[in-house]
Amino acid sequence: MMNANRLPTRILGLDPGLRRTGWGVLAVEGSRMTHIAHGVITPDEKAEFADRLLHLFEGITAVIEQHRPDEAAVEEVFLNTNAQSTLKLGHARAAALIAPARAGLLVAEYSTRLVKKAVVGTGAADKAQIGFMIARLLPTAGKTTADCADALAVAITHANLRVANRRVA
């Protein structure tokens, strides 16, 4: 999938969830970011657990095939007070990690707190603040759902940190 000759670099951001997995694709060239596309993958809540995970995997694979990103970034799981919910979210996250890895993409992972800090300036930002900043940073994205805004925030975080990490190395 990766195309070393293509500029700008395309980054897929993923906000995994069992009910809704948000995704967003950015084109990045230097410090300039351009919105390409975003959406939500929504498995049938009545489907068997394994089928819901398969739907997520296949949905992410379809996004990769359509938008041909060079790299991917996935938000890490936050610890929930309900261990069962956290475990199920971990399964959804696994689908979000495996699909881009299977496509040969570099896959980075970022904590929720780091994503919030990178996009809003504070690790304690709420969904409304993230949505506001996505509208400011990517005005061509238009109105986004919270899941899409989170996925685009993950992609922005990766875009910024991958450049910073190259400068350090």
UniProtKB/Swiss-Prot annotation:
TM stretches of this protein: none
UniProt binding sites for Mg(2+) 2: 75
Protein's organism: Caulobacter vibrioides (strain ATCC 19089 / CIP 103742 / CB 15) (Caulobacter crescentus)
Cofactor: Mg(2+)
Cofactor binding mode and count: Binds 2 Mg(2+) ion per subunit.
Similarity annotation: Belongs to the RuvC family.
Disulphide bridges, residue numbers: none
Lineage of the organism: Bacteria, Pseudomonadati, Pseudomonadota, Alphaproteobacteria, Caulobacterales
EC number assigned by the record: 3.1.21.10
Protein known as: Crossover junction endodeoxyribonuclease RuvC
Compartment annotation: Cytoplasm
Domain of life, source organism: Bacteria
The reaction(s) this protein catalyses: Endonucleolytic cleavage at a junction such as a reciprocal single-stranded crossover between two homologous DNA duplexes (Holliday junction)
GO molecular function, one term: crossover junction DNA endonuclease activity
GO biological process: DNA recombination; DNA repair; SOS response
Protein purpose: The RuvA-RuvB-RuvC complex processes Holliday junction (HJ) DNA during genetic recombination and DNA repair. Endonuclease that resolves HJ intermediates. Cleaves cruciform DNA by making single-stranded nicks across the HJ at symmetrical positions within the homologous arms, yielding a 5'-phosphate and a 3'-hydroxyl group; requires a central core of homology in the junction. The consensus cleavage sequence is 5'-(A/T)TT(C/G)-3'. Cleavage occurs on the 3'-side of the TT dinucleotide at the point of strand exchange.
Keywords, alphabetical: Cytoplasm, DNA damage, DNA recombination, DNA repair, DNA-binding, Endonuclease, Hydrolase, Magnesium, Metal-binding, Nuclease
Subunit details: Homodimer which binds Holliday junction (HJ) DNA. The HJ becomes 2-fold symmetrical on binding to RuvC with unstacked arms; it has a different conformation from HJ DNA in complex with RuvA. In the full resolvosome a probable DNA-RuvA(4)-RuvB(12)-RuvC(2) complex forms which resolves the HJ.
Active site: 15, 75, 147
Binding site for Mg(2+) 1: 15, 147
InterPro entries reported for this sequence: RNaseH-like_sf, RNaseH_sf, X-over_junc_endoDNase_Mg_BS, X-over_junc_endoDNase_RuvC
Single GO cellular component term: cytoplasm
